[in-house]
């Protein structure tokens, strides 16, 4: 099967049998094509987030998240998927001690990555916070705007402005409105798997040769996740006249912040559940509503990590 077919299979398959699990584990340990493994992990993750609880699927995610068995992109996707599933199915997980032990073992195999993934998920949920604050600000300011300027009007505006600035300082998706349009191309309407394909330079072959050099430079910008690259690449000819105006390429490209790949994959997940017509699930809304569940006393690695996450969440 191709990578996309593997994604579709694990996303749409029903409850797994014990034989299915043994086949999957054997396949992962044989270290096949990394892209296929990563797409299979994404399919498993979506199957759980979109449908119903399946303990065996969670166990397979835990196996894929264990860095003693997998590496690189496969491990990263599995850890992020595992954390999202644990948040969504908090009750089911916390009442199953055997499963808790298995999940804990997988996350402890790469504590730094698990912590980074948890922080990335937490930061990403703040994107919705910007929208909510904008609506709240409009609702509170509207009646005040019909009156004479007052101290109250200034205070309300200042409060909301500070809140929005605080949220955006967390390095959130500041170009989200731009990419919302870019994701309307046929590539993303054809199949759900296209939202999760790892970026490949071969995709540039569809771009006019005169534009290719500039697009290659643009696609090295750290802030862009893989699906953004496909979105921008497939829509480049239509955006040509306004591209430099909408995305300050030089400013972004010179940013010294180290790229964290888990941030990119969380962005891809967020975009899929936010913009895709393939799903009605809203796992990131659950994360936002149940924020206290992000700080798992049996997930975070050691007191220092737990304190760091608690500090991150203060005031949210």
Locate each region found by the language model.
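Alpha-helical solenoid scaffolds in large eukaryotic transport, assembly, and signaling factors
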Residues: 1-75, 81-95, 105, 125-129
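Long alpha-helical HEAT/HEAT-like repeat alpha-solenoid scaffolds in very large eukaryotic proteins
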Residues: 2-3, 85-91, 95-163
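Charge-rich, solvent-exposed alpha-helical interaction surfaces
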Residues: 5-9, 102, 140, 156, ...
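Surface-exposed polar/charged interaction patches
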Residues: 9-16, 27, 31, 67, ...
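Conserved aromatic-histidine-acidic binding/catalytic patches
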Residues: 49, 65, 70, 160, ...
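C-terminal regulatory domains involved in ligand/effector binding and gene-expression control
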Residues: 132, 163, 167-190, 194-195, ...
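The transition from N-terminal targeting/processing segments to the mature protein
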Residues: 183, 187, 198, 204-210
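Alpha-solenoid helical-repeat scaffolds
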Residues: 207-316
